[in-house]
Amino acid sequence: RPDTRWDDPDNEIVIASGPVGGITQYSGAGKSLVVTISPQTDSVMDSNVGGFFGPFLKFSGFDAIELQGKAANDVIVFINGVDHYVEVFEAPAEAIDSHVLAEQLTEMFANDESDRKNIGIVSTGSAADNSLIGMLNFTFYDGRRKKIRMKQAGRGGIGSVFRNKKIKAVVCKIPGVKGNLNNVVDLEAIQERGRRFNREMRELDDSQCRMRQVGTAHLMEIMDDHDLLPTHNYKYGSHKDAPRIDSAVWKSFFTQNIPDGCWIGCNMACAKAVDDYEITTGPYAGQKVIVDGPEYETAAGLGS
């Protein structure tokens, strides 16, 4: 309805990939879009995100999922793409913060260590319970680090909508990944274009975008040079101190020589991370975690 507000039960969270979602022969096919009515604007918003959940949802037979209504207590939605059923159950005991919850749920739903790569989770955290800027975290299993990592749908406060519905997590499990699980019409055409793109990445990325070195953070100096950096909430397009947050700074933090990627077969490998970052404040002080990013949007929107 036109008068639906962000915290109305009728407000939906929609998560979808696309016609070639999850295809491993073309880079970027692991992305999903998340749509809802934003608590910040009371208007429709969308956010783009990587991670395993979108492709796994597609492989389980769903083009999209719509989360509507409100639960009385915290719940987990489980999409079983192995035995083909969906289950909703209460989850009072599990953690709320994603970096802890994701590990708990992966252990809960994976059959063994080798099955951890077949679990995709959407969750948020305690910040979403206490603000209108909560984000959604989408997990992916980093086989090289043997750890669960996360990408973010960070715009519009969508995580706050998620928690307002009393959803603690949405979990999707599949039996494994193959080359054409969503049965695209013309796989040969995708493969041909994928090979072309992969060749360009191999030959040009190190001298152009450097996605495999610094991810989307390479855009910082480009946007500053072209007067497009959102400085002081778009009052200006550049700033003399922009080099303090440009890609060279982030590269010094990012772990190098690891082919990062938030989806299988994506040759951009732009999911850069800071390993063993020690938290210095709050309830997790002293713990060492993996910090993903920052992406350009975070560095520019919150840094400039």
Features from the language model and the residues they span:
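Intrinsically disordered, low-complexity segments enriched in small residues
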Residues: 1-48, 52-304
